[in-house]
Amino acid sequence: MSISLGNAFIKNFLGKAPDWYKIAIISFLIINPLVFFFVDPFAAGWLLVVEFIFTLAMALKCYPLQPGGLLAIQAIAIGMTSAEQVKHELVANIEVLLLLVFMVAGIYFMKQLLLFIFTKILIGIKSKTALSVAFCFTAAFLSAFLDALTVIAVVISVAVGFYAIYHRVASGQGGTPSHDHTCDSNVTDELSRDDLENYRAFLRSLLMHAGVGTALGGVMTMVGEPQNLIIADQANWMFGEFIIRMLPVTAPVFICGLLTCVVVEKLGICGYGAKLPENVRNILEEYESEERKNRTNIDNAKLIIQSVIAVWLIVALAMHLAAVGLIGLSVIILATAFTGVIEEHAMGKAFEEALPFTALLAVFFAIVAVIIDQELFKPIIDAVLAVEDKSSQLALFYVANGILSMVSDNVFVGTVYINEVKTALLDGVITRDQFDLLAVAINTGTNLPSVATPNGQAAFLFLLTSALAPLIQLSYGRMVWMALPYTIVLALVGLFGISFLLEPMTTMFYDFGWITHGTIEAATNAVSSGH
């Protein structure tokens, strides 16, 4: 049936997004200029922020780049901010953009090593509880040095591989290379179907443990999450100092996070507790044994090279030898040069995962520019900063960041809050020591409670929108339900750390000489976003 040209334009607008979503975005684009010019620019600014958060919350209906980008372009066009201010934000946060472009691509060329590690873990550990802790801990360790998105990408590729191996055998097509593991129609044996359902539940729980692990590790270092880099840059902290300043909160949270992993597996609550079926284990062990036999010296040489590059990566990051993105670029060069990847099309695949998110981050910064120009957060920040009790001030910042990060993206929230606190410091409203404590509250507030929903953590959203999610029946609701015990524990232990441990332990670190008191001059010299 032919379609009219007018209907074709409507159908093409935001593609397969539901009609109600398209109408909502068009309504936003009509309402915003009217409110800005005829009601109040401040109200229009807040309306834009709410609309942008809506596009993030509806990320499964439509990737937020397109609707969020349209809102951002209109905001610049009608004068809510300027293209120059957006450029200023991008330049100020160039390290984050470099991280996303080069580091994620760099790790792509080390996938063989990471796949090898996770394969050994999955096959080698018989206890489900121990395996869950191992996945959570390994994901946390890797996320402390690498990007959480990359770690989740690796875990997903491992899980898809293992799922496909068993599905092929269960479908009676063990030797078929072109087997479609997304179709269950050939899995007719009831025993195989039961095993498949249990295996799906097993993989779901492992992926959620790994996902939370990326949050546990990601909060600890300045390279763990994109907003950490922004906060470290504004505070003028180096790699080591960032870790030490976060320890009063991150250490108890990490321990309690791993304990939560054990408890949910032992009790079998919130969708956890599924064990690896024996039939599946036998099939996977046979596969791993076959792979080991077929591994050539070429493959071994690649694994050795990638191991050496991994050591270089950790040392370079720990010693802050260059901007994180540039270290990522060095990984791309070393990994491709020494493993023989020299064709342009082979290299291009490495950049596919990160670039859409990098573009979305640029749109975030356009919204941040509006928030700065319209001074949207000023009343809230002023109210929190006006609280005389410093401990209450820290707790309020943590809670405010946490709640916003559950519904919005934590990069966006962290950027906005650190900008406002930096302004307060430069205006003499707070001391440099209080600024440092607030920076810790902002960093932990954006990283820990945000595990509640896929909207908050980019790694969770990446998992939810991956090809694996429908295979193992991981829906939005199921993800929120499985994250619930972690959300409660991480948020409350984080709040306890902010309220009772942060100030005394930071004072102790000063006394030990592990960190030194910062100066306002140092913060002024750091690249200042939005000023």
UniProtKB/Swiss-Prot annotation:
Catalytic reaction list: 2 Na(+)(in) + 3 H(+)(out) = 2 Na(+)(out) + 3 H(+)(in)
Signal sequence coordinates: none
InterPro entries per the UniProt record, alphabetical: Na+/H+_antiporter_NhaB
Keywords, alphabetical: Antiport, Cell inner membrane, Cell membrane, Ion transport, Membrane, Sodium, Sodium transport, Transmembrane, Transmembrane helix, Transport
GO terms under cellular component: plasma membrane
Any one GO molecular function term: sodium:proton antiporter activity
Keyword Methyltransferase: no
Keyword Ion transport listed: yes
Subcellular location: Cell inner membrane
Membrane topology field: Multi-pass membrane protein
Membrane-crossing residue ranges in chain numbering: 13-33, 34-54, 90-110, 121-141, 145-165, 206-226, 242-262, 308-328, 352-372, 394-414, 456-476, 482-502
The family this protein is said to belong to: Belongs to the NhaB Na(+)/H(+) (TC 2.A.34) antiporter family.
Function text: Na(+)/H(+) antiporter that extrudes sodium in exchange for external protons.
Protein name: Na(+)/H(+) antiporter NhaB
Organism: Aliivibrio salmonicida (strain LFI1238) (Vibrio salmonicida (strain LFI1238))
Source species taxonomy: Bacteria, Pseudomonadati, Pseudomonadota, Gammaproteobacteria, Vibrionales
Gene this protein is translated from: nhaB
